[in-house]
């Protein structure tokens, strides 16, 4: 789904050019020169310190001269649904959010089209729609190859390399490029002298420089270059067993110990780039414990508990290493040993790729608060979906990640006397995805599974979020602004729709002779006879001549074809369920106008609640039924008609929340600090004329 493992490894091997440089003499001379320059600069800094303090103070006073607030603290609760939130507030189960509602503002927040986290959070930060920030889905397609790419970032290897025997040395650094367009509001604030701390907001990788601190969120890859690949180890002989989202590795018993190898990133210094592997052994003990020995570390594992984050160093070639971190989870010791390792996260203390701005910020957080997850999608939903983790161990993982994020937020708020702090929490989203089936006894995902024990998981995640809001609110003063919001709501995901299967059945998509349609990423498609195809979680593209590599649809015929598809897909009937699977189909050019509209899907499918793109369709397969049951634990979703999944908006100030949209938040924050709205922003400020704060502090 994400950048390739090889490309990521190039980043971890970036210092390789130093090993074929001019030599040690240059390095020694350079060090002496650096020392002289450092002494000179140190004296200059000391002499000019009083003047710089006066100038900085003057600039700060000017920056806040028009501000209506000392601090703005934004808490993002990904996926918090207004129906559930309102029901729980009515029952008295979320008192802190109720207090915000009663003394300040509460309203439903219009999400984006489509209602996906990368799209919505991009609109949150830029104040613009997809046509202006260029993010339309988790995935975009490459019109040259028809293959999917990560929509938010591009990682390319260095242009030059040097091969010496079986080794390949990379000359230079990989190219990292953020694909989101338009400027985030914190960069605008920074240009006006207002400092921001931004924590784990989606679509902030790679970090862009601005006047502030940032730790990147969703779409940060793991050390293998994927969006999260777990490893499951077992002594059981399960030849041929495969997992989506992870790898199964056989453990070997050897005279009382168990040996295994943890697969890591590709060894980019070697021809053919095999994966680096880190050997380890497990010594079973008594009372449900075992000793893990890996990378020179000895750690006691307890059955049913996660280890701390362990640093791991992988040899990639001569002079090249990449450091990552992972947690280990001992599932069982008998009759077979089963051991789970989280995806190998980039080590925040020795990041193989830039994950923060400035780069030292990730190191500071780790030294100050302890090592933490850096993977964008840190909650391992695939491990639960595949049955590698059970519900209890997944929830424990979510709890650990929530606590890490909370420590970061409390640290940032405590260090910020004036300015903006933004932090997004993912737990509400991940728990609803994986536990929605417990709300519906007849959900197809409950077949053959226990369906009662975790019925309160979603409400407990909401209560946890409410408690967080209370802790942050109690730390704020009367001159501070607190905003709590979600990017979208949630609905059940009972049935999956394969739009490509429908396009094939209705003559818009054709397969190559002899192909079955089972191939992933549309590899079975005959592009010379295909007029439309679907990629991602709701996007439909026309195969336009001159835009796609093998396009056949003349541009002048595209509007008519779009309208034909809109009419035929709208109200698509689910024969088995006896209802419509599709509410509406949107013309992207109409709902998301802007300079980047043509790079996104031509149409966006707005599914009815209970439906979503099927799992096969999400992998680019054409074969199979048009509509089928969703039997996976991932049983809730939000990739539906955006009108069905608004988010929530709370604030301790009185805001004009009538028809409030996700893209209105950025202009609102700017106006709180007295900064005008840039022309590229489509949103409006929600500040009420009085602008009075109204939060009664705990």
Where are these regions (language model features)?
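Substrate-binding rim/cap in mid-to-C-terminal beta-strand-loop elements of soluble/periplasmic
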Residues: 503-555, 630-673
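Hydrophobic alpha-helical membrane-interaction elements
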Residues: 20-46
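Polar, surface-exposed loop/tail segments
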Residues: 207-210, 492, 557, 562-564, ...
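Metal-dependent active-site segment of extracytoplasmic phospho-/sulfohydrolases and closely related
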Residues: 462-503, 580-588, 594-596, 604-606, ...
């Amino acid at each position: 789904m994400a950048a390739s493992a090889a490309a990521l490894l190039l980043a971890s091997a970036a210092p390789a050019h130093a090993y074929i440089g001019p030599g040690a003499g240059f390095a020694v001379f350079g060090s002496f020169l650096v020392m002289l320059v450092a002494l000179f600069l140190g004296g200059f800094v000391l002499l000019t310190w009083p003047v710089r303090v006066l100038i900085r103070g003057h600039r700060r006073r000017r920056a806040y001269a028009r501000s209506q607030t000392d601090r703005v603290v934004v808490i993002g609760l990904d996926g918090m649904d207004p129906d559930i939130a309102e029901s729980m507030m009515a029952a008295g189960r979320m008192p802190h959010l109720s207090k915000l509602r009663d003394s300040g503002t509460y309203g439903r927040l219009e999400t984006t089209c489509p209602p996906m986290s990368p799209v919505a959070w991009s609109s949150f930060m830029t104040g613009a729609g997809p046509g202006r920030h260029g993010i339309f889905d988790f995935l975009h397609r490459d019109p040259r190859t028809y293959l999917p790419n990560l929509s938010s970032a591009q990682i390319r290897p260095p242009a030059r390399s040097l091969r010496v025997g079986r080794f390949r040395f990379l000359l230079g650094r990989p190219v990292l490029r953020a694909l989101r367009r338009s400027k985030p509001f914190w960069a605008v604030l920074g240009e006006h002298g207002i400092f921001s701390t931004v924590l784990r907001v989606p679509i902030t990788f790679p970090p862009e420089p601005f006047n502030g601190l940032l730790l990147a969120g969703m779409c940060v890859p793991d050390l293998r270059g994927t969006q999260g690949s777990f490893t499951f180890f077992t002594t059981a002989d399960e030849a041929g067993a495969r997992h989506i989202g992870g790898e199964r590795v056989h453990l070997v018993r050897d005279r009382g110990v168990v040996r295994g190898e943890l697969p890591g990133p590709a060894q980019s210094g070697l021809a053919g780039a095999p994966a680096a592997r880190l050997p380890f052994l497990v010594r079973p003990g008594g009372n449900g414990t075992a000793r893990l020995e890996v990378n020179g570390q000895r750690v006691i594992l307890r059955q049913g508990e996660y280890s701390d984050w362990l640093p791991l160093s992988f040899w990639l070639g001569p002079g090249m290493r990449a450091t990552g971190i992972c947690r280990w989870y001992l599932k069982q010791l008998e009759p077979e040993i089963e051991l789970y390792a989280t995806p190998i996260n980039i080590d925040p203390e020795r990041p193989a790729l830039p994950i923060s701005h400035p780069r030292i910020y990730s190191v500071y957080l780790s030294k100050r608060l302890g090592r933490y997850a850096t993977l964008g999608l840190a909650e391992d939903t695939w491990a639960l979906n595949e049955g590698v983790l059970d519900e209890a161990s997944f929830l424990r993982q979510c709890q650990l990640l929530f606590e890490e994020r909370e420590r970061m937020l409390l640290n940032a708020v405590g260090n910020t006397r004036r300015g903006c702090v933004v932090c997004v929490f993912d737990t509400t989203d991940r728990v609803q995805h994986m536990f929605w089936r417990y709300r519906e006894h007849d959900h197809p995902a409950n077949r053959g599974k226990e369906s009662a024990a975790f019925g309160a998981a979603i409400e407990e995640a909401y209560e946890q979020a409410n408690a967080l809001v209370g802790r942050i609110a109690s730390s704020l003063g009367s001159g501070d602004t607190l905003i709590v919001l979600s990017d979208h709501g949630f609905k059940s995901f009972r049935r999956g729709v394969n739009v490509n299967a429908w396009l094939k059945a209705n003559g818009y998509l054709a397969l190559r002779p002899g192909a079955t349609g089972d191939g992933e990423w549309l590899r079975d498609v005959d592009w010379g006879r295909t007029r439309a195809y679907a990629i991602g979680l709701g996007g439909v593209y026309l195969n336009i001549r001159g835009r796609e590599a093998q396009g056949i649809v003349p541009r002048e015929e595209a509007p008519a074809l779009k309208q034909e598809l809109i009419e035929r897909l709208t109200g698509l009937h689910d024969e088995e369920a006896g209802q419509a699977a599709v509410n509406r189909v949107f013309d992207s050019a109409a709902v998301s106008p802007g300079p980047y509209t043509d790079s996104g899907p031509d149409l966006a499918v707005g599914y009815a609640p209970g439906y979503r793109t099927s799992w096969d369709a999400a992998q680019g397969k054409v074969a199979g039924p048009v509509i089928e049951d969703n039997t996976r634990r991932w049983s809730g979703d939000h990739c539906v008609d955006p009108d069905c999944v608004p988010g929530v908006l709370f604030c301790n100030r009185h805001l004009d929340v009538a028809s409030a949209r996700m893209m209105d938040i950025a202009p609102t924050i700017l106006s709180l600090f007295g900064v005008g709205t840039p022309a590229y922003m489509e949103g409006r400020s929600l500040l009420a004329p009085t602008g009075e704060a109204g939060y009664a502090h705990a």
